[in-house]
Regions:
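The DNA-contacting recognition helix of HTH DNA-binding domains
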Residues: 33-34, 107
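C-terminal regulatory
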Residues: 139, 151-264, 290-303
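Central regulatory/effector-binding core of bacterial HTH transcription factors
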Residues: 94-154, 303
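A short LG(V/I)-centered, amphipathic sequence patch enriched
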Residues: 44-61
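Residues within the DNA-recognition helix of helix-turn-helix
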Residues: 32, 39-42, 113
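Conserved amphipathic alpha-helical core elements
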Residues: 43-44, 251
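Short helix-boundary/capping micro-motifs
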Residues: 15-30
């Protein structure tokens, strides 16, 4: 190899590694798919190795391609940090931050928080990905994300955002039509609203397993927003954290003292964490979660 690879070729390499197909990578880069293919061919020829296995399903990194990826991502992070510094990021955060969050948490907690952040940072923009799953940070779907399962491999900054509890809730009309609930064993006679079990975004969402019996799931939804509406319409009991339940009386807590406890983790790729705009969102989420324990648990924070 007589010359070093061009950074732009490595950028095309990263986008194809993340997207998996030429067309998806081309959309991210705002170029034709033939341009992506040509850049990858040039990079492979320059390095004298095959970086991707090609198939009808798309492009998958070879072993050597996977070995190159963290080096290319480190270069990407350095380029982003350099651009921020040159543009005066030491004075004010600017640019776009893509934040991946669970859907209800994103709508009810994070969106109002981002509105206040943007008022104080006129050069900052937020892409809020409020999803019924967790953002794929490995493919750079988001710059940082809130999730139940922190990554165990790769270069990430990870911190516990908050411990939270799922409590039992039901509509008053449902409770009026069904046998009373005074102890946990009474729950076996009731209907439940839950996630679609073969579409769980995380095994941590199988909290109904902690009931001690197999619940009678009358309606299952892929996201919590659908569950909240179904439970409010009297279709069964559901479990949810305090921040998810509207204070409009449509749902009331059942069986005080029973809950399932989980933790949210805040995660960002290590190279993106260095960016001022990403750290600004990171620090805001950390500070807000610490200051609002009632969003996550009823009563004292410890058992």
């Amino acid at each position: 190899m007589n010359t070093l690879p061009e950074w732009t070729d490595l950028r095309f390499f990263l986008e194809l590694a993340r997207a998996g197909t030429l067309s998806s990578a081309a959309r991210r880069l705002a170029v034709e798919h033939t341009t992506v293919a040509r850049r990858i061919d040039r990079l492979e020829a320059q390095l004298g190795t095959t970086l991707f296995d090609r198939s009808r399903e798309g492009y998958e990194l070879t072993e050597l391609g996977a070995a190159l990826r963290p080096h290319a991502e480190a270069m990407e992070g350095a380029a982003l940090a350099a651009a921020e510094h040159v543009k005066g990021a030491d004075v004010a955060a600017h640019g776009v931050v893509r934040l991946g969050v669970p859907e209800v948490f994103g709508v009810r907690v994070v969106a109002p928080l981002m509105a206040r952040l943007l008022e104080n940072n006129p050069d900052l923009s937020i892409d809020l990905l409020a999803l019924p799953r967790f953002a794929n940070l490995a493919n750079r779907e988001a710059d940082l994300g809130v999730m139940l399962d922190p990554p165990t491999t790769g270069r990430y900054m990870v911190t516990r955002l908050a411990s939270f509890r799922f409590y039992l809730y039901a509509a008053p009309a449902y409770l009026a039509r069904h046998p009373p609930i005074t102890q946990q064993s009474d729950l076996v006679r009731h209907d439940f609203v839950d996630y679609v079990q073969d579409r769980l975004a995380s095994s941590e969402l199988s909290y109904l397993n902690e009931l001690g019996f197999t619940p009678r799931r009358r309606l299952c939804c892929s996201g919590m927003s659908g569950q909240l509406e179904a439970a409010a319409l009297g279709m069964g009991l559901m479990m949810a954290p305090p921040y998810a339940v509207p204070h409009d009386g449509r749902l009331v807590q059942v069986l005080d003292g029973f809950y399932a406890e989980r933790a949210f983790w805040l995660v960002a790729p290590a190279d993106l964490y260095r960016l001022r705009r990403v750290r600004l969102v990171w620090d805001l989420l950390r500070t807000y979660a610490d200051s609002q324990p009632a969003l996550f648990q009823h009563g004292p924070a410890s058992r």
